[in-house]
């Protein structure tokens, strides 16, 4: 993995976790959505619907808090096993913005950092835009901005597969023991335009990771669905949609479904509303027992 830090190359002075960001209180939601949309025309009723989604999940996204917890855990791990590097957090769409974090890093004397994009699968939406945002932030700071290299993609890393598998195994205990073998694992990821997907390894990496988790758990019944579609209805996006899959599972007699958002590495509105509220309502309406790994 040529972009990873090595013990023989001690030039890295910090780690930078790069995430999307999210509103931390209800008053932040509309400014946050303005940042996300960046002037793109969206029907007002759609914006109001998303605002209501945040109201239903407590008026905030836990993404920022969870990302900082991940940063602290990584910093502790690095202190224990080396190299003992500080871990910073920078966000695309909310505070702390990437340019703010890079400015703090520069002030602390950081010249070169290793960046970790907080998404396990690669597409332009999940990786490319983040790298361009880092480039723009560095350009804003000027020639002495910290250099940022990136770890390679990690969709099939054994520790990632183990972590997801452990959470899924815990979720399956909510299903009666005699029905677990017949339960359906339904892996989900954010839908993206099909043209974007075709230009990236996104679908292959999602499917590969899902297969590895299913094999690790010896679970024969599994499939992949996409969620949280947005954008123009005239533009084709990845399918099948999770709602359609849940209805089809019920029609073929499935009783239990364990939903695994393998395309996300922590909770936020697409998990807490799109899955825990919207998808759960669909499942319950068609008679499915809906369980999600947490």
Question: Each predicted region: which residue ranges?
Answer:
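Active-site-proximal alpha-helix that buttresses catalytic centers in soluble enzyme cores
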Residues: 2-294
